[in-house]
A protein has these predicted regions:
Chain B
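A compositional/biophysical signature of low hydrophobicity enriched in polar/charged and small residues
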Residues: 1-166
């Protein structure tokens, strides 16, 4: 059925389907695939967390919570942020519990954007940022990170700013590059935000998973709490992707605006997941430590293996991705990923789906058992041998 | 004894999987293979890593199912040597898999493996309870091992994730 005018919104019509989708379709039908294409932990949620959720169901906590989420959970989030990242938010007015970091990003953008407002989106980045900016009526302006380690060049950021620019979106540690920004690099971005009076939307969902240096939050940079929207959640650090639980923190005025959008569009995050999140913050830390250690070992293994195979790979400070360059093969990211999948049944994600500067790279998730990583490396070695020029 | 972070890391990896190759250990800890070998030698020399073993599920091997019993043993400690002497007399028997000194209602916890309940019963009545300082024993037979030394015997290892995701 089709109306004469066409019934799809122009914005939605113009959104490109995610490049990840194609690889999902390709890989899904195959047997015996070793997947390095998964953007979520290979750990199951810690049992203590699952058990707390079951208990909440048994006790009948099955109704709505406050729009902003259980106060007890917001208080626990506030304590957690202060203790781990040295940032202070008032649980009563500056924290909203959301349906994943995904929804947090959505309500942040919808709360700040007017038609044609521009948002600088540092690429390569998580595939949702630009589409969510568009859906909120804004215009995403991609700014490419530097190929050498995928840090952000302050000059490039400055050059992209126009009178319509409203915010900069960053993600550290980053999906897909794993790159973590240190204090100095954050300060450079902060200086730009201050001089041009911009907000920073800081996606810190991987903050728990850092392996070399301690983590610095954008909101902890001097003078930045006032212009930062801090996005985070439970999916990655606590291995809780399927629960759909995240949160967003911002100064009161911004938070109250986001709460309006959240209240009308979502009501509240799932109650069972909120009880699970509470338990995760109270008693999940030991398991997070274990997972972090395990990821660190696998990161070291992957970085060393790729470099040994001749696919240059920087050692990322966080998340669970490595982003090796495949330029030496003479293949494009898409060709490499597709041929590797078909010939050796190893799924990776071509870097270009995360932005133009991801071309020439592939994202390999090491959220897989060490045996699987070993098998993947073995197959990639064989693939490279067969493709030697 | 104080270990460096990397030494500790190696201990932890091997405790989970003692078959991890030196090359993989090196890659996982960002050491060279020869540095890794040095660490291993040190850990072995110091008896920090005492032995490399496997966890076996004997219940799967016909004719070798065997039985395991945990025995609470009350003893009278001896002047001068405390519990150590009686512990030694007990742990030297090859049937004895573990001996722990416990706090609480009894003194030694002894784990015994044998071919049959009869064999274990015979050991307890003839060897263990006849030792001079042993006052009493209480034997518990293990009916099924679900988890042993941190390892679940029948884990659910199915990967429930979709193959490619953002
Ligand atoms: C950078 C980044 N932000 C946000 C998300 C979404 O997380 P959530 O599950 O909390 O919606 C992801 C998930 O892949 C991510 O990689």
């Amino acid at each position: 059925m089709k109306t004469k005018k066409g019934y799809l919104s122009r914005t939605v019509n113009e959104l490109k389907p995610s490049g990840i989708r194609r690889f999902f379709d390709l890989a899904s039908g195959m047997e015996g695939v070793v997947s390095l294409g998964v953007g979520e932990p290979d750990f199951v949620t810690p049992w203590t967390v699952r058990e707390a959720a079951i208990l909440s169901l048994e006790e009948g906590y099955t109704s709505y919570t406050a729009n902003a989420g259980l106060l007890e959970l917001r208080e626990e989030i506030a304590t957690y942020l202060t203790k781990n990242f040295n940032v202070t938010y008032n649980p009563k007015s500056e924290i909203i519990v959301t349906v994943g970091a995904s929804q947090a990003i959505d309500i942040a953008l919808r709360s700040i954007l007017d038609p044609d407002d521009e948002v600088l989106v540092v690429e390569p980045c998580f595939v949702s940022y630009s589409p969510l900016v568009s859906l909120a009526g804004g215009t995403p302006i991609p700014v490419q990170a530097e190929a050498d380690g995928f840090k952000i060049s302050p000059d490039k950021l400055r050059a992209a700013i126009t009178p319509k620019t409203k915010a900069i979106m960053i993600c550290s540690p980053n999906n897909p590059t794993g790159t973590m920004l240190n204090r100095k690099e954050l300060e450079e971005i902060a200086a730009i935000a201050k001089e041009s009076d911009l907000l920073v939307i800081s996606d810190e969902i991987y903050a728990e998973l850092v392996y070399d240096e301690s983590y610095t939050s954008m909101a902890a940079i001097e003078g930045m709490k006032d212009r930062t929207i801090l996005i985070s959640g439970f999916s990655k650090g606590f291995a809780m992707t399927g629960w759909r639980l995240g949160f967003v923190c911002a100064p009161e005025e911004l938070s109250q605006a986001m709460l309006k959008v959240h209240q009308y569009a979502m009501m509240c995050a799932p109650t069972m997941a909120q009880y699970a999140g509470l338990e995760a913050l109270k008693n999940g830390n030991d398991e997070v430590d274990e997972m972090r250690k395990s990821y660190r070992r696998r990161r070291n293994y992957m970085v060393s293996s790729f470099n040994e195979l001749g696919l240059e790979c920087h050692s990322p400070g966080g998340a669970f991705y490595v982003f090796p360059s495949i330029k030496s093969t003479g293949l494009t990211s898409d060709q490499f990923a597709e041929q590797l999948l078909i010939e050796e049944k190893v799924a990776v994600v071509p870097g270009n789906v995360f932005g133009e500067s991801g071309e020439g790279y592939v994202r390999c998730s090491y959220a897989a058992s060490i045996e699987q990583l070993q098998e993947a490396i073995k197959r990639i070695r064989r693939f490279l041998k067969n493709h030697q020029k | 004894m104080q270990l460096t972070d990397k030494e500790l890391e190696i201990v932890e990896i091997l405790e989970k999987d003692s078959r991890t190759s030196n090359e993989d250990l090196a890659a996982m800890t960002s050491l060279t293979v020869s540095e890794t070998e040095e660490v291993l030698k040190k850990l072995e020399d110091q008896k920090i890593i005492v032995r490399y073993t496997s966890i076996v599920d004997w219940s799967k091997i016909s004719g070798h199912e065997g039985v395991t019993a945990m025995i609470d043993v009350k003893v009278t400690p001896k002047r001068g040597v405390g519990f150590d002497e009686i512990a030694k007399r007990i742990y030297r028997f090859k049937e004895v898999k573990s001996v722990y000194l416990m706090s609480g209602a009894y003194d030694l916890s002894v784990i015994i493996e044998g071919q049959s309940m009869n064999e274990v019963a015979r050991f307890v009545s003839q060897k263990l309870s006849t030792l001079d300082s042993v006052i009493s024993t209480t034997t518990h037979f293990i009916l099924k091992k679900y988890k042993h030394d941190g390892t679940i015997f029948e884990p659910d290892e199915e990967d429930k994730r979709i193959v490619v995701s953002p």
